[in-house]
């Protein structure tokens, strides 16, 4: 496997993917965000490459389209960290549900209260490699999750980075997402109002559904509750799924982040608070996928690592 080292904050940005979803025979009708994740059964050489996103991003859709950037040489980087002779190719993947464990490529989180799913795209990565191309991507995996020692240092307010495609906006020339830095509004490890979610102090718009939330400790990170070390540490903290709005009657409404051209009622005011499921829910879904690894061909692509 060929890997190219890039700065950590650049690597995690390369984990995102812009998702277009639609019905069979029709053009895409919704847009959302996903991120590449490598799920394995304890053996990193025997893994699946999936796109993690929200269930509501692909609900009612028969397929997704997304663009992957690849090159025959990731070592030759131009301005902005773009590989020389890069090739952007849009891929079409049919969503296969409830056929058989050997055929299905759609993995929903088993809880109806968790808006999280994964779509297996291992074959797409393999096809790129078979053409002697290397993928400009960072696959998030268990190494990007916080350890128990790192969780001990989590405070109520932490700096975070959210990468995605608000209102579908993206850098289409370079196939790059929009990245923003903000803070948590509630503790990322504590269930908000008894539900497995936390709040982020950041405006969340349509198209942001499925955006990864990273604990963004730059330029210093905590080694304990009271000690800091120079350097950076970025860990997956969760995934965006909703936002909080206020009605003209003063009621606070929780809504899924819209994925299509659905106008929001004028009497609703966005509170600039997003809702995210914690990384533990992603870990659970990855474990479910890992338990089925031996049923499919393994995939270990050439990647950018951090």
Which sequence ranges carry the predicted segments?
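N-terminal targeting leaders that route proteins to membranes or the secretory/organellar pathways
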Residues: 1-4
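Long protein-protein interaction modules used by eukaryotic assembly/scaffold proteins
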Residues: 6-9, 37-39
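C-terminal subregion of chymotrypsin/trypsin-like serine protease catalytic domains
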Residues: 9-12, 215-306
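Serine endopeptidase catalytic core focused on the charge-relay Asp
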Residues: 13-18, 22, 30-31, 46, ...
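A conserved glycine-rich beta-strand in the N-terminal activation segment of trypsin-fold
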Residues: 22-50
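Residue-level recognition of beta-strand microenvironments
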Residues: 37-39, 187, 216, 242
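Cytochrome P450 catalytic-core helices
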Residues: 53
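Histidine-centered active-site/metal-ligand motif
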Residues: 56
